[in-house]
């Protein structure tokens, strides 16, 4: 029988190397910790120099406050920090770092040299370590005010960790992504990156709104900026601002999603769920939304100390945060209209509430053009850049693109269109399109129908192509949703109630949310500590698997405090009804019918995509048409 192992203290060197496994995974992890220290030091410019993807060399130089000579050795000790003093400080921490273990972990697995000088010091001082096998040596050095940290030969003393590193290009891509994330978090700081002697990018300080937009374009691509909707909303102490990509600018991977909480980038499942819900009706299956969003909240109501790499946070009132994020993004996306997507470059949309669904002009089956008798006011609030300052300072630099107060009625639009094409009196010159773009509807006037599928229209920008079935499907779908919301859900009692075996926690959750289930057409009754009975279901969902649906909804309520599964099932059914009720391919439409459909699209929420996330229309500008025919060359 083998001897029982005895408990003993680990050596400081081994303890640091084990701790490094949590903090230092690859060169990108080192860059993150060093850059966060530079930002916490009040830097206004940070230079990063990399060799071999950061494996051979990673040097970060800043112009921050610097570190006093006496504190340099202490900076490399574990759990030594200048950012917090007591537990209460942790509850309101705003610095990116606060644990005091990053430099100790890095210096235990690499050759580290740190040089620093404060503003009141006559000279700089330098400290060197080499894998914790040597005591830190402090000596005078030449350096301007600020700090430089040089990390060489990462994992030189831990071969097992080094062999898990990927190719140089892969490691550099990860490192570059870290710098981009921080560059978006701090518009007021300049970032410069060099790799193997070559300048990769130089991002200058961005103080005003236009400069911030340029940085977003430099980091995320100009295409994102051109297809993004700027938003800013503040309510009940919660402030959300940034850019959300239009549904037509989706990605196959979630690689263009940046979300910051008080300046700290996080990947939180609560946030991901809220964003996914907001885009639910407009994204094609398997596609991912794009966004750069900044969420600001009182530090006392968010816990950032829940993950070793601080990528996750915990909100005190997660339900309120979830509903605020979902509601803001859902309204912003719902208020996008064709004229937002056709607005002049540099303009942002300040959208007003407008009628939707049944309130929109109806596209009649026989070419009738009429307005609904009752107008349902949209509850959406104004979404757009306000004139106030944002988190990074400065005021809005965007000019407002203002829509007409109300779209013309369909009868007026049809009359104007008929007059435009009416035979001219003898000797009268041909009519020209209005000189002002504001006199032409965003989707223009119909010219013809192609193959019984597409509508060709002319607007101020050029040619518009519309998938008439997809467009009418979205219009019908939105009307059905409005009708369901106004009339409520009718419940259907079950002749034989269905019983469900659940855990006691799940039963408590169902009982707590019984009124919520009731509003959605369900009636649940608790039979015992671990059993429920379904006595009523929504009439529209009589074909659904009620037992599994209730289980899934309860799981969501326990996880997120809310659930959209019932609504998703209802929307799926309404989508099917809309698809069958929409105008079919190969149906010949008259010009008034086509124009009625275009006007409906202009005042219907989410009309840019059908119920399945496919685009309903596209624009071919005159420049694009000229290129096709080699004009102007």
Swiss-Prot record:
Where are the stretches annotated Disordered? Answer: 337-364, 383-405
Task: Report whether DNA repair shows up as a keyword of the record.
Answer: yes
Matching entries from InterPro entries are given as:
DNA_mismatch_repair_CS (IPR014762), DNA_mismatch_repair_MutL (IPR020667), DNA_mismatch_S5_2-like (IPR013507), HATPase_C_sf (IPR036890), MutL/Mlh/PMS (IPR002099), MutL/Mlh/Pms-like (IPR038973), MutL_C (IPR014790), MutL_C_dimsub (IPR042120)
Its keywords, alphabetically, are: DNA damage, DNA repair
- Could you confirm whether the keyword DNA damage appears in this record? yes
Pfam families in the record, alphabetically?
A: DNA_mis_repair (PF01119), HATPase_c_3 (PF13589), MutL_C (PF08676)
Q: Name one GO molecular function term.
A: ATP binding
Q: Where is the composition biased (Gly residues)?
A: 385-396
GO:BP terms for this protein?
mismatch repair
Annotated membrane-spanning segments are none
Q: Name one GO cellular component term.
A: mismatch repair complex
PANTHER family hit by this protein: DNA MISMATCH REPAIR PROTEIN MLH, PMS, MUTL, DNA MISMATCH REPAIR PROTEIN MLH1
The family this protein is said to belong to:
Belongs to the DNA mismatch repair MutL/HexB family.
Q: Which NCBIfam families match?
A: mutl, PRK00095.1-2
Chain's role: This protein is involved in the repair of mismatches in DNA. It is required for dam-dependent methyl-directed DNA mismatch repair. May act as a 'molecular matchmaker', a protein that promotes the formation of a stable complex between two or more DNA-binding proteins in an ATP-dependent manner without itself being part of a final effector complex.
Q: Under what name is this protein listed?
A: DNA mismatch repair protein MutL
Organism annotation: Pseudomonas aeruginosa (strain UCBPP-PA14)
């Amino acid at each position: 029988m083998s001897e029982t192992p005895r408990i003993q203290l680990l050596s400081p060197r081994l303890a640091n190397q084990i701790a490094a496994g949590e903090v230092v995974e690859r060169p990108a992890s080192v860059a993150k910790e060093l850059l966060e220290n530079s930002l916490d030091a009040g830097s206004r410019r940070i230079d990063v120099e990399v060799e071999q993807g950061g494996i051979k060399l990673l040097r970060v130089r800043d112009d921050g406050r610097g570190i006093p000579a006496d504190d340099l050795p202490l900076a490399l000790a574990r759990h030594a920090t200048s950012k917090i003093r007591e537990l209460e400080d942790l509850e309101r921490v705003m610095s990116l770092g606060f644990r005091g273990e990053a430099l100790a972990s890095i210096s235990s697995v690499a050759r580290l040299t740190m040089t620093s000088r404060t503003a009141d010091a006559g000279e700089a001082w330098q400290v060197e370590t080499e894998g914790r096998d040597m005591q830190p040596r402090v000596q005078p050095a030449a350096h301007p005010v600020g700090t430089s940290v040089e990390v060489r030969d990462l994992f030189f003393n831990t071969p097992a960790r080094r062999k898990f590193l990927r190719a140089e290009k892969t490691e550099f891509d990860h490192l570059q992504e870290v710098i981009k994330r921080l560059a978006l978090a701090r518009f007021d700081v300049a970032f410069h990156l060099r790799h193997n002697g070559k300048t990769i990018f130089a991002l200058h300080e961005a103080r005003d709104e236009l400069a911030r937009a340029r940085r977003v374009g430099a980091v995320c691509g100009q295409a994102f900026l051109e297809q993004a909707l700027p938003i800013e909303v503040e309510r009940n102490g919660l402030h959300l601002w940034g850019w959300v990509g239009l549904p037509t600018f989706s990605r196959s991977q979630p690689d263009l999603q940046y979300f910051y909480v008080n300046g700290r980038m996080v990947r939180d499942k609560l946030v991901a769920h809220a964003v996914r819900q907001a885009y639910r009706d407009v994204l094609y299956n398997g596609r991912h939304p794009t966004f750069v969003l900044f969420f600001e909240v009182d530090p006392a109501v968010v816990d950032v100390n829940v993950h070793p790499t601080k990528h996750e946070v915990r909100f005190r009132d997660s339900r309120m945060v979830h509903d605020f994020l979902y509601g803001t993004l859902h309204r912003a996306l719902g208020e996008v209209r064709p004229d937002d997507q056709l607005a002049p470059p540099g303009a942002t949309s300040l959208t007003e509430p407008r009628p939707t669904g049944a309130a929109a002009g109806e596209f009649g089956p026989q070419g009738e053009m009429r307005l609904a008798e009752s107008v349902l006011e949209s509850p959406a609030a104004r979404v757009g850049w306000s004139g106030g300052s944002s988190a990074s300072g400065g005021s809005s630099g965007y000019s407002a693109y203002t829509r007409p107060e109300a779209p013309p009625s369909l009868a007026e639009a049809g009359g104007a269109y008929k007059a435009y094409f009416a035979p001219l009196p003898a000797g009268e010159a041909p009519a020209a399109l209005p000189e002002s773009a504001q006199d032409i509807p965003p989707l223009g006037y119909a010219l013809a129908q192609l193959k019984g599928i597409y509508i060709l229209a002319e607007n101020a920008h050029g040619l518009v192509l519309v998938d008439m079935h997809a467009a009418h499907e979205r219009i019908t779908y939105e009307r059905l949703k409005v009708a369901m919301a106004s009339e409520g859900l009718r419940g259907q009692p079950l002749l034989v109630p269905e019983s469900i075996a659940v855990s006691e926690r799940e039963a408590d959750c169902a009982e707590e949310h019984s009124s919520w289930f009731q509003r959605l057409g369900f009636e649940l009754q608790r039979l015992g500590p671990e059993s429920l009975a379904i006595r009523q279901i929504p009439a529209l969902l009589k074909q659904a698997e009620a037992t599994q649906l209730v289980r899934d909804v309860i799981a969501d309520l326990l996880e997120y405090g809310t659930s959209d599964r019932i609504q998703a099932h209802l929307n799926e059914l309404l989508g099917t009804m809309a698809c069958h009720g929409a105008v079919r391919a190969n149906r010949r439409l008259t010009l008034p019918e086509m124009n009625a459909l275009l006007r409906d699209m202009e005042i219907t929420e989410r009309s840019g995509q059908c119920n399945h996330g496919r685009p309903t229309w596209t624009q071919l500008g005159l420049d694009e048409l000229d290129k096709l025919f080699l004009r102007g060359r």
